[in-house]
């Protein structure tokens, strides 16, 4: 396979050791394939605030304000501060989850398709992260539905994909994402508190 570098006068023979065949498939010219799949990559010390909103369960929504790794305030969807003991291990693990969140691939939806699948009743959560410099990134997570196409789960047809979701990044880019990735982020306000200590008999 011949390849020519930018500003080069002559092409070069390109070889991958152990590979026999055309290299075209290894060097795709579609820019979306080469695009960084990063959505969130924040060390906890660079996070100023995280807001997670659940349209169908506002009581489970929450806002985290991060002063530093040892000082994080937690409020519910009504702005009420957390009551009870904070589960520090869970909180620390949750903040660490934002260090590496990626989508699977970019998808192009026709306007008619977009209007029928990215609908309010399919919206699972909206997550907004603000860094220490005030820059904001927001995503919307939708149940993955495709115009009546049936998904199969353990031999049974279901309306929504059980493995993947649609992710809308900054209200522009639409991507496929995996539940196993985003389940780390879509936790409940109540998960940040330790269960009450039961008195000993």
Task: Spell out what each predicted region is.
Residues 1-201:
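Soluble, acidic/polar mature domains that operate outside membranes
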């Amino acid at each position: 396979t011949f390849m020519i570098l930018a500003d080069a006068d002559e092409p070069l023979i390109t070889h991958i050791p152990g590979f026999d065949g055309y290299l075209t498939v290894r060097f795709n010219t579609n820019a979306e394939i080469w695009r960084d799949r990063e959505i969130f990559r924040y060390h906890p010390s660079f996070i100023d605030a995280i807001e997670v909103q659940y349209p169908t369960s506002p009581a489970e929504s929450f806002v985290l304000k991060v002063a530093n790794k040892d000082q994080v305030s937690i409020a519910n969807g009504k702005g009420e501060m957390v009551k009870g003991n904070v589960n520090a291990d869970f909180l620390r693990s949750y903040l660490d989850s934002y260090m590496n969140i990626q989508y699977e691939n970019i998808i192009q939806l026709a306007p008619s398709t977009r209007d029928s699948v990215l609908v309010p009743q399919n919206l699972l959560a909206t997550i907004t992260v603000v860094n220490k410099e005030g820059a904001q990134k927001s995503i919307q997570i939708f149940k993955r539905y495709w115009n009546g196409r049936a998904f199969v789960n353990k031999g049974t047809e279901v309306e929504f994909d059980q493995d993947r979701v649609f992710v809308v990044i900054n209200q522009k880019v639409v991507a496929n994402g995996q539940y196993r990735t985003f389940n780390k982020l879509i936790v409940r306000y109540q998960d940040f508190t330790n269960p009450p200590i039961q008195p000993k008999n």
